[in-house]
Amino acid sequence: MGGIPNYSLMIDYINHCGDGASADLSAFQFRTKSATNRFIKAVEDCFLNFKSDEHKSLFLSALASNDFSFEEKLVVLYWQIVCCNNLFREITDNVFLRALYSGRSSIAKADVEAYLKYIKAKEPEELNWSDSTIANSASKYLTMLKKFGFAAGTLQKEIKAPHLSSALFVYLVKLALTVYPDERTLANPLFRFSFLDNQSIITRLKTIEYIPLWNITQIGSDITITLK
């Protein structure tokens, strides 16, 4: 995914073909048939796997909606690849978010490489990559963060956490409860990728504007969310 030059192209493709409909791929101006096939496979593997029809509808509707800006749609893409791609999710959780939540202002390629080498040593059957493949993958991961709008710079990537608008926050809550319907608390795995701490999530969940959307039950620090 790091090799795709423009993520607006990816959004256009998903809007044309995400529901299984065929489209005239000549509009996407790939130089070769093999480049077209690589693009399609990358998008389908990373973004077009769904837990349910409701998940699929929620994601495709968000990308097609005029209620989200392009920058917000990039965040929607980020949450979707977190749902679809185990390795991206693991790197993000253990490298990018760990750096963000610990107060670091930047991450480097070496951070990602070190984590990939750790996975290789721990689970060689899962990640039997050469050092050059690991280095290339680390570079592509940071490129993806930059294209999502979460990083800036060249060697040392400055971390740029996005602001979650009301529309994005509502989407996140609905997505979390759709993908993990049995996890209606703050332990829902997707909340880890929200760029918000638990208290900030609770505060926003209780905001008056969201009363028509969900019910909140709180006992101590435990909170349960039920969509209306």
Name each model feature, range by range.
Residues 49, 98, 118-122, 144-151:
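Amphipathic alpha-helical interaction surfaces
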Residues 146-223, 227:
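Accessory, usually C-terminal, subdomains that scaffold auxiliary metal cofactors
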Residues 103, 117-137:
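Short, positively charged loop/turn segments that connect secondary-structure elements
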Residues 43, 47, 116, 205-209:
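Hydrophobic, Leu/Ile/Phe/Ala-enriched alpha-helical segments that form helix-helix packing faces
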Residues 1-98, 107:
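Eukaryotic partner-binding/assembly regions in large regulatory complexes
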Residues 31-39, 131-147, 196-207:
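Short amphipathic alpha-helical interaction segments
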Residues 86, 106, 135-139:
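Alpha-helix initiation and capping sites
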